Amino acid sequence: IFDAPQGLIVVDTGRSPMHAQAILDYAKQRHRPIAAIVNSHWHLDHTTGNFDIRQAFPNAKVYASTAIEGALVGFLNNGRAQGDKVLTDTKTSEGQKAQLLRGRYRVDHPDTLRPTNPVMRSGRVTIAGRRLEVHLAKFAATEGDVWIYDPASRTAIVGDLVVGLVPFMDTACADGWSKALDEVAAVPFQTVIPGHGDPMSRADFLSWRKAYNDFVA
């Protein structure tokens, strides 16, 4: 979460109600509105909370790539049959069912998943009055991944281009992902915030990039 002159900038909003509520609680504690959301990519564990936040702050802008459009008619739509199996499986907990239905509702009502301000190319962008470097990586972890470099804090927020676990390849292009990691390495960051896992130093990131390239070689 970034401070900006016009309010808070939230990068990714999580999946569960607890994720969204934690963000809303933080805004309340700070006595600041949420002015903008940046979605690093369309995966529902990064975007489902858009609905909750925009209910509370309907004027919040959403910055994201347009890759959600292909996902809605492709990956997310194709996963519906698998979701039906999970919902009818007696081993599925009520909590898991509620989470799946929450995500499905967002897919069926996708307005809050779509960007109000589409990111079409990399460049410097003023978001809620704060100047940030917004990058678009095409055909990487998804068809369009958005990552941010903040020169003031020398922090790169990269979504699932970096994760603490094994990379999720189901929606990925391995070569494009490797190129995106090279683009991240080219900025003078001190800290990387991954899509999952703990913050990384530059040395940690370079080690992860090498492991990724070895993994897909």
Name each region found by the language model.
Residues R131-P188:
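Active-site-proximal loop/helix segments of hydrolase catalytic cores
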Residues F2, D12, A27, H41, ...:
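Divalent metal-coordination and catalytic microenvironments
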Residues V11-G14, A35-H43, Y63-T66, A156-G159, ...:
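Active-site neighborhood of phospho(di)ester-bond hydrolases with catalytic His/Asp-centered motifs
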Residues P17-M18, W42-T47, E69-L72, A141-G144, ...:
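Active-site environment of divalent metal-dependent phosphoester hydrolases
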Residues I1-Q29, V146-D160:
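Conserved beta-strand hairpin/beta-sheet module of binuclear metal-dependent hydrolase folds
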Residues M18-A64, V187-P188:
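Active-site metal-binding motif and surrounding structural segment of the metallo-beta-lactamase
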Residues V73-A137, E143, P151-A152, L181:
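Metallo-beta-lactamase
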Residues Y149, T155, D175-A217:
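Divalent-metal (often Zn2+) His-rich catalytic cores of metallo-beta-lactamase-fold enzymes
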